[in-house]
Amino acid sequence: MTRERLYLYDTTLRDGAQTQGVDFSLEDKGLIAQQLDVLGIDYIEAGYPGANPTDTKLFAAPQKLGLAKLTAFGMTKRPGRSLANDPGFQAVLAAKAPAICLVAKTWDFHVDVALGITPEENLQGIKDSVAAVVASGREALLDCEHFFDGYKANPAY
């Protein structure tokens, strides 16, 4: 058995809310977050500030939890925009959360086809986005979208 600490990250309140027929209210999210905290979850990804009124309101005045870190979810900055000129990124950065998880394209195919930029431009955008979260005094987490597909296609990237 290893002595390294395993951290638990729950996405029920954001990813689970994408299920057809599921629509968490602000109160629902609060009650579920409290129970996840009691269960010992370290990070609770509670939503995507700026994506809908419930998540924006949740992160404007987040509830206090015991040990769990309420985590805001968002995307790295959009290509062709500065951090300051990206409303989506700014909404996530404005969240009053101790941790922010940014999703980033990590498959060079998606970088080319979906983003239309070079791999180097993508990596710089990721670096700049993470640096902005850290500079704001919060913990930055990175969700490497389609990591295994990307690794299979291009391990060097």
Which residue stretches match the model-derived regions?
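Hydrophobic, small-residue-rich alpha-helical packing segments that form membrane-like cores
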Residues: A61, S82, D86-C101, K105-Y157
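N-terminal capping/small domains of soluble enzymes
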Residues: M1-S82
